[in-house]
Amino acid sequence: MSNRSAVFGGAGFIGTNLVYQLIEDGQQVFNFDNLSGLGNLLNIAELMQQSRHSFARCDISNPEEIRQALLMAAADTIFFCITPKNPEEESSLDNFRTFFETVKEWRNGMTDTKLHKIVVVVSEHYKLLGSYGRMYTDLLKLLDGYVADGLPISSLLVPPAFGPFQQPDSPISMIIYHAIEGETIPVVNPEEKVSDLVYVKDVVDAIVLVEKNGKIGGHYHLSGPSCGLTNLEAADVICESLNEELPPPVGRYQALIEEVATSPVTSDIAKDEANLVVLGLQGKTSLEDALRKTVNWYLNNPRWYNQSRTRFFYLWQNPETVLKIA
């Protein structure tokens, strides 16, 4: 692995977890985020005094800010952890073009650049499942074009993830927030099997694997672990963990569950993990273990949780918008 890494989108959910892992691996990390959307300085607050971590704001629609970030980092590896917020819009990839065009110009103008790999991480979000297909196809064409121009790009597509540092914008985090707050716990399509859901630590492992072993121009897919749990059973695992670690004043957290029927939410991208397995992908964390670890993380980080609960009040108080409840 490289010694100097630049992470764009490094204050978001997946980016934050990646930054922590890179620092743990001994990397010098240059972290760039525009702090729009769910990007959150609180995610990286404890890293601000670390000598191996530097943070600066960067808007990937601004070529000058991108150039300044590239000059500052002088990175061996770039991790791009930003996914379009509106994948169905024609303009969804405009910022991607700006970013990679700027990187190409910068690299062509440097005689001593050490940049050897750019890993583009495309993460599906539960709320937008079923709307990524066309954007993803167009993105791969865009990336292939820049590979042909000489940029050392590999990509990784990941399904909806959950785990530490996640705001209440997915079914798992929504359940945890509502349970801790003693609110009704919405469980969508309770009898459906959990499918294509992955622990964020496994996502980070896959990103690092692609950086280390992935081919230039390679496009890789990560799938969730095989799981026999229904959505209701997954909620029960979360509630049981909370019953043990944070017993409610009365009864059990399961009493808060409200079953909600809605249209099935599925991805419109067919994933094939075979190429990632060839790189050396290891077994993933089981859903049950990952859910318990996630609950424990929230309970062990009350300062982060309390600030997130306040800042993102509009999310966890409006589950129908997050969970696509009709």
Question: Model regions: which residues?
Answer:
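C-terminal substrate-binding subdomain of Rossmann-fold SDR/epimerase-dehydratase oxidoreductases
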Residues: 24, 179-183, 187-326
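Generic structural signal for small/hydrophobic residues in well-ordered secondary structure
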Residues: 14, 33-35, 44, 175, ...
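Conserved sequence/active-site signature of Rossmann-fold short-chain dehydrogenase/reductase
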Residues: 61, 126-127, 161-163, 198, ...
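The catalytic Tyr-centered alpha-helix of NAD(P)H-dependent dehydrogenases
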Residues: 128-136, 164, 168-172, 196-200
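Conserved SDR Rossmann-fold cofactor-binding beta-strand/turn motif
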Residues: 157-162, 176
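Short, surface-exposed alpha-helical segments at coil->helix boundaries
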Residues: 41-42, 137-140, 173, 232, ...
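N-terminal Rossmann-like NAD(P)+-binding domain of SDR-like oxidoreductases, especially those catalyzing
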Residues: 1-159, 301, 318, 326
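Hydrophobic alpha-helical packing elements
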Residues: 14, 65, 135, 171, ...
